[in-house]
Swiss-Prot record:
Molecular-function GO term, any one: RNA binding
Gene name, Swiss-Prot/TrEMBL: EBNA1BP2
Name of the featured protein: Probable rRNA-processing protein EBP2
Coiled coil spans: 138-169
Positions of post-translational Phosphoserine modification: S7, S9, S11, S13, S16, S264, S270
Listed GO CC annotations: chromosome; nuclear periphery; nucleolus; preribosome, large subunit precursor
Pfam families in UniProt: Ebp2
Protein purpose: Required for the processing of the 27S pre-rRNA.
Length: 306
């Protein structure tokens, strides 16, 4: 006869009943404390089963000769220049600082050296060869495929470093190029401003030459210094002022130099009669040249033809 499956509520009630029973048993044994609803497990006790350990050791222990085992237990070799017998060490005090990498590696090296010095004579007595034959092929610990991968990885890393270095150099060159370009543009602007100032000075008569047209290749600072020095040394009116004085006179009061005096009134040496009566102003022309007849004459001539 098949029993119907239990519902979720019935299964939860059975689990709760089992849990309650366990809690009651634990409480009766004194494993529960006030405020706890979980059984606390006590700390595990360490068992030192000496007989069991010896039995396990006897199962895999083999009495082999030393040449098959090649085990030695030695201390480090004495340091160079020190006493041959190793100095007694205190067990409580460590001879080598484990945090010092150099001392730790040197202790490994000295201990291996002591083992080699102690084992080689025994191997020679047992006639065990300690040197490899000339045709011995020693296979590497790592395969060629793995070494090839390591080589490719190193090459990739080196190529990445070279690309990074080239990128740094290109950035530095671009930065330097921008700096040089900016300096060139500033120099051109300064030269242009100097040229415009020279043109303005030439137009106003402050200068009688244009340096940039004469191919003056001196630096701008020297030209400015020379121009300022020339202006300080130059005395007298400018070229523009001299031209205007020549054309229009000096202007202002002439101190009576052009007033009529007795001497100037009596001086008739420069008098010309033809010029005074207007005869000298006429231009000589061809005598008997044909002139256009007047309006009435032209009308009479026209009526005659009709």
């Amino acid at each position: 006869m098949d029993t119907p499956p239990l519902s979720d509520s019935e299964s939860e009630s059975d689990e709760s009943l089992v849990t309650d029973r366990e809690l009651q048993d634990a409480f009766s044994r004194g494993l529960l404390k006030p405020g706890l609803n979980v059984v606390l497990e006590g700390p595990k006790k360490a068992v030192n089963d000496v007989n069991g350990l010896k039995q396990c050791l006897a199962e895999f222990k083999r009495d082999l000769e030393w040449v098959e085992r090649l085990d030695v237990t030695l201390g480090p070799v004495p340091e160079i220049g020190g006493s041959e017998a190793p100095a007694p060490q205190n067990k409580d005090q460590k001879a080598v600082d484990p945090e010092d990498d150099f001392q730790r590696e040197m202790s490994f090296y000295r201990q291996a050296q002591a083992a080699v010095l102690a084992v080689l004579p025994r191997l020679h007595q047992l006639k065990v060869p300690t040197k490899r034959p000339t045709d011995y092929f020693a296979e590497m610990a790592k395969s060629d495929l793995q070494m090839q991968k390591i080589r490719q990885k190193l090459q990739t890393k080196q190529a990445a470093m070279e690309r990074s270095e080239k990128a740094k150099q290109l950035r530095a060159l671009r930065k330097y190029g921008k700096k040089v370009q900016t300096e060139v543009l500033q120099k051109r602007q300064q030269e242009k401003a100097h040229m415009m100032n020279a043109i303005k000075k030439y137009q106003k008569g402050f200068s009688d030459k244009l340096d940039f047209l004469e191919g003056d290749q001196k630096p701008l600072a020297q030209r400015k210094k020379a121009g300022a020095k020339g202006q300080q040394m130059r005395k007298g009116p400018s070229a523009k002022r001299r031209y205007k004085n020549q054309k229009f006179g000096f202007g202002g009061k002439k101190k009576g130099s052009k007033w009529n005096t007795r001497e100037s009134y009596d001086d008739v040496s420069s008098f010309r009669a033809k010029t005074a009566h207007g005869r000298g102003l006429k231009r000589p022309g061809k005598k008997g040249s044909n002139k256009r007849p007047g309006k009435r004459t032209r009308e009479k001539m026209k009526n005659r033809t009709h």
